[in-house]
Swiss-Prot record:
Location, primary (coarse class): other
InterPro entries registered for this protein in UniProt: Fimbrial_K88_FaeH (IPR003467)
Protein name: K88 minor fimbrial subunit FaeI
Family: Belongs to the fimbrial K88 protein family.
BP GO terms, sorted: cell adhesion
Gene (UniProt): faeI
Signal peptide: 1-20
Alphabetically ordered keywords of this record: Fimbrium, Plasmid, Signal
Subcellular location: Fimbrium
One Gene Ontology term, aspect cellular component: pilus
Coiled-coil annotated residue ranges, if any: none
Cited function: K88 minor fimbrial subunit, plays an essential role in the biogenesis of the K88 fimbriae. Fimbriae (also called pili), are polar filaments radiating from the surface of the bacterium to a length of 0.5-1.5 micrometers and numbering 100-300 per cell. They enable bacteria to colonize the epithelium of specific host organs.
Amino acid sequence: MKKVTLFLFVVSLLPSTVLAWNTPGEDFSGELKLEGAVTSTRNPWVWKVGQGNESLEVKQSRGVRDGEQGIPVALPALTVLLGKTTLTTPAGREGLSPGVSYGKGAEGFSLEWTAPGMAKVTLPVTGDKNVRAGTFTFRMQAAGVLRHMQDGQPVYTGVYDDLNANGLPGESTAMKTSDIPGTLQTMFSGEGPSWLQTMTVSGYSGVSHFSDASLRQVEGVYGAQIVAGGGELHLNGAMPERWRVSLPVSIEYQ
């Protein structure tokens, strides 16, 4: 009986106009109002792969013709991949954390994080008639930032891989926080969000924290770039007329 009494009491608090009928025979007009919060499920990340370079010149030498040594390749700094959020997500949620992976399905591919924010990448080389001709090695740097609001102030943290992907270093080899702003500003060259130019990065978070529901007003950036110089071509035998490498890129959200 107590439950019934409480229920009736709650109902009695509803506006009487909800249950009111109009006077018989009079003209009638009314309005039904519906409202609620809007939660966007649109993924805010956009990505751009670098243009590459098809004019890298390699000079022959006797040792190279015999397949006995590597050939230095003067690489310029080249964009590998840029990513940014174009919308501010009200709170972290599932499906917002990007797992960037390189080299999926490429036989002979390897990526090893050797220094803070720096990786050694090895790709298989194809030569004439798409025949496997050797390997190409270069250095790549990568970093990301997670931005969210806390007590009315923006917080910027460097992100490291905790999704078992290879597009970011682990926590122990993450880029130094003091190096992240300048590095990403150079990579984006004015195409990043406005806060990229003024941010101060403090501390680190796993990239999975983009899905942390306790975070508010979530945004982020990611950048990877080939480091100028340091490329090396290793051939299995005679020098082909042309050599090619490609770096597969894939992104899965978690």
